[in-house]
């Protein structure tokens, strides 16, 4: 008997804070749902893109503040899980529109970026103070976009107490990109005990398409089976690109039912 699980994703909030908290708490209690938060709706400007790995002090500080505001927001609306991106090996990022390719400016070394990211994560861990679980997302392997945290060894320095939101679409895309048939197995073996949530979407291996479950080639049931070998199933979130693929409300509702069947492991 799964309790509905709704992720508040990245975007822009135009509602006054206390009013928004009231609306969400009313909805949560009346509908018995669990909320979770991904990235942030608290950005300093519309074109700001969170990068906790930046060497630009202002961008890194503002990025940490975005997540800190999330932690405060989480405490006010009964959220236990927050997830976000571990960063990029670049000082500044921009994006023309949601889900467009990120434009990296002022690249920095991966070593420097990981140092910055780990430092930011340790700061955020103190702010979360063990009552909010923090997770970073595994990225696609795309060096041209300066992504961090895409291969097994990238997670070796992840601070204790920081979890992972495992994106199955990113796993499959990266396995095909690296041409490493054992990549998904190795990632799950290395990270399964740290997985707090799972982003589920489908693709054909050629691109990170974020399609609904069953619309691509990913063996989603088999991947979930491997994750739950030695643990309970984490919370599952369908993360599909509604506008790009012209999905209707019915498409989304039916896909939730489809995932519930797949997740009966």
Could you say what each language-model-derived stretch is?
Residues 53-163:
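Active-site acidic/histidine proton-transfer and metal-coordination neighborhood
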Residues 7, 35-37, 81-85, 133-137, ...:
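A structural signal for short, well-ordered beta-strand segments and their strand-loop junctions
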Residues 10-12, 41-43, 86-90, 138-142, ...:
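Active-site-proximal loop/turn and secondary-structure-junction residues that shape catalytic pockets
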Residues 1, 17-24, 95-97, 119-128, ...:
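Distinct, well-ordered alpha-helical segments
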Residues 61-80, 91-97, 159-265:
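Histidine-acidic metal/acid-base catalytic patches
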Residues 31-33, 132, 230-234:
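A short helix->loop->beta-strand "cap" motif at the edges of active sites that frequently abuts
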Residues 1-70, 75-76, 162-165, 264-265:
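N-terminal pre-domain/capping segments
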Residues 25-40, 120-127, 158-160, 220-225:
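Alpha-helix-loop-beta-strand connector modules within alpha/beta enzyme cores
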């Amino acid at each position: 008997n799964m309790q509905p699980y709704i992720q508040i994703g990245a975007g822009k909030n135009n509602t006054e804070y206390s009013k928004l908290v009231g609306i969400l708490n009313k909805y949560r209690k009346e509908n018995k749902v669990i909320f979770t938060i991904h990235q942030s709706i608290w950005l300093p400007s519309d074109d700001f893109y969170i990068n906790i790995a930046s060497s630009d002090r202002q961008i890194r500080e503002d990025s940490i503040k975005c997540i800190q505001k999330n932690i405060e927001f989480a405490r006010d609306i009964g959220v236990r899980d927050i997830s976000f991106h571990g960063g990029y090996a670049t000082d500044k990022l921009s994006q023309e529109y949601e889900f467009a390719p990120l434009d990296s400016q002022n690249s920095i070394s991966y070593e420097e970026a990981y140092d910055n990211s780990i430092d930011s994560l340790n700061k955020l861990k103190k702010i979360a103070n063990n009552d909010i679980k923090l997770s970073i997302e595994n990225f696609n392997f795309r060096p041209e976009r300066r992504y961090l945290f895409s291969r097994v060894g990238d997670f070796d320095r992840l601070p204790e107490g920081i979890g992972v939101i495992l994106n199955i679409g990113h796993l499959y895309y990266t396995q095909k990109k690296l041409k490493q048939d054992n990549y998904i197995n190795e990632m799950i073996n290395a990270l399964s005990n740290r997985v707090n949530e799972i982003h589920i979407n489908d693709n054909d291996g050629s691109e990170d398409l974020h399609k609904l479950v069953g619309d691509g080639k990913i063996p989603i049931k088999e991947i979930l089976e491997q994750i739950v070998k030695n643990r309970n199933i984490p919370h599952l979130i369908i993360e599909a690109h509604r506008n790009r693929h012209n999905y209707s409300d019915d498409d989304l509702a039916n896909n939730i039912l489809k995932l519930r069947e797949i997740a009966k492991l």
